[in-house]
Amino acid sequence: KAIAAIETSGTRIIANPNCRKMLNRGQEMKNSDVLQLADDMKLEAVPAYNTTPGRDKFHPKGRDNGYILTLGGTRIYIAGDTEELNQMKDIDIAFLPVNQPYTMTPEQAIRATQIIKPHILYPYHYGNTDINKVKEGLKNEKTTEVRIRALQ
């Protein structure tokens, strides 16, 4: 339903193999695949998975993707459904999911932000999670602006 709501005849769908199979269309990207979309636009598929014991059944390692979109010199990390992963570096804008049991706790999102050090953080997927905990926990991080948007 979400894709249908915004899709046009020119929409290019890029998905991990599992989602590609469910959609029965689109271009498949696996962890570590890189796609050059234009001269100054690159998309990298990065791992997205649960790390908390007992939660790995929701997003097992190797199945799902997050993405790093590079536009010119700006690197945007869209984490997908994942928990705190320490390997992300040189990120300008980060979109991090905050909603246990499927993604990060507020504390994990705070730690991930402190490691990644993006200029801008957009927490998302937070449902009933008190997202202000993330903003409060990062209030002393002078290099990161936390932007919270109410999305439908």
Predicted regions and their residues:
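Short, acidic/turn-prone active-site loops that include or flank metal/cofactor-
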Residues: 18-20, 31-35, 48, 98-102, ...
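Active-site metal-binding motif and surrounding structural segment of the metallo-beta-lactamase
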Residues: 1-15, 90-95
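Alpha-helix C-terminal capping segments
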Residues: 6-8, 19-24, 69, 86-91, ...
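Core dinuclear metal-dependent hydrolase active-site scaffold
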Residues: 26-90, 104, 150-152
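Metallo-beta-lactamase
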Residues: 65-132
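Short, polar loop motifs at secondary-structure junctions
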Residues: 1, 14-22, 30-33, 82-83
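Short internal beta-strands
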Residues: 10-18, 120-125
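Binuclear metal-ion centers of metallo-dependent hydrolases, dominated by the metallo-beta-lactamase
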Residues: 24-37, 41, 110, 114-152
